[in-house]
């Protein structure tokens, strides 16, 4: 009965989860882990790509159209540049695009690089979310975020100037 209410003709939204972060924020309630040198990201990415492949196959078999794609986390930008490009290009290839809207959660300033922003933009993402949480240094410290308000502002400036993002959150 629940699936009877889904408007398949207008498409569906695809969520790609990267459940890893550089550190764990004290307020976080998400099912995510800290990426360390011992984290087997190759195994996670292989499993994620298999999940993407199977999901895309089902969508094609059922005639479903993708309306939007969102990559969230955790912190998707905890992926290395090559990993980020691999996952995004694979998903776009399997699903044949992203529909009308494509957003990537860029997460934390300590994981964002110009190269990652360029990869995200080159894959077609029109929106990124940098998630400042707060611009108060004391609050950032209390919740376990290791960046500063200036780091947030610098990332926003980089996204606007270097990569020409206009839809920032």
Language-model region placement:
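Structural motif
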Residues: 11-13, 25, 101
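Local cysteine-cluster metal-coordination motifs and their immediate loop/turn environment
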Residues: 17-32
């Amino acid at each position: 009965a629940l699936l009877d209410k889904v408007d398949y003709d207008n498409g569906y939204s695809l969520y790609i989860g990267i459940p890893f972060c550089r550190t764990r924020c004290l307020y976080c309630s998400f099912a995510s882990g800290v990426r360390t040198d011992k984290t087997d990201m190759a195994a996670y990415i292989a499993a994620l790509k298999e999940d993407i492949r199977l999901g895309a196959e089902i969508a094609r078999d059922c005639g479903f159209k993708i309306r939007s794609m969102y990559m969230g986390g955790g912190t998707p930008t905890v992926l290395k540049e090559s990993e980020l490009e691999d996952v995004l290009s694979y998903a776009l290839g399997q699903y044949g695009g992203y529909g009308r809207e494509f957003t990537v959660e860029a997460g934390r300033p300590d994981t964002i690089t110009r190269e990652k922003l360029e990869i995200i933009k080159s894959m077609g993402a029109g929106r990124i979310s940098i998630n400042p949480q707060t611009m108060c240094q004391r609050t950032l410290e209390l919740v376990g975020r290791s960046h500063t308000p200036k780091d947030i502002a610098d990332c926003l400036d980089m996204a606007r100037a270097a990569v020409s993002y206009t839809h920032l959150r």
